[in-house]
Amino acid sequence: TVVVTISSLSASAETSLLFIGNSFTYAYGSAAKFYRADSVTDLNNEGIGGVPALFKSFADQAGLDYDVYLETRGGSGLDFHLENKLGVIGRRPWDRVVMHGFSTLDSSNPNNPAVLIDTTAQMSNFLQELNPDVEVFLTATWSRADLVYQSDSPWNGTPIEQMAIDVRAGYDAAA
């Protein structure tokens, strides 16, 4: 008589990493949006790969063991994720979280970092309630030419790098 025992081995990675963001996270309008979507877990089940899948690919090549997740919504800031996605985000504690807000700091009041500062603190507190040891990384977005050259933009008539400087200053204040 031969007895075969099959044991269940945990397939989870050493470190969980969640990306929270918008189209800047998944590269809207590019092939990267769906790049290697099967290598990451899209918490919204939209089949997105994007920057999280690129990170996963680089991590794998470097021999780093990450379970990579993403929770994204195009055109949104952290305020959207706080108001609508805490149930999804809070399903588990995270080891590391990479997040960013709206590309102009505030969709209703461009170049004003107040909402970003407030929502970064709120999201960080929520994530720390899930895991007191979570590492939270805030990544700034980049300049958008379509917003620098519009007449109603706070960056109208300035060099494109001014938007980058202002956005970075907002993220520095939020950090």
Predicted regions and their residues:
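Conserved beta-strand elements of the Class I
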Residues: 16-18, 97
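C-terminal edge beta-strand
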Residues: 2-4
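Conserved SGNH/GDSL esterase-like catalytic core that processes O-acyl groups on lipids
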Residues: 27-120
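Boundary at the C-terminal end of the N-terminal hydrophobic targeting segment
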Residues: 11-15
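Alpha-helical cap/lid subdomain in secreted, periplasmic
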Residues: 86-175
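Short polar catalytic/cofactor-binding loops
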Residues: 21-26
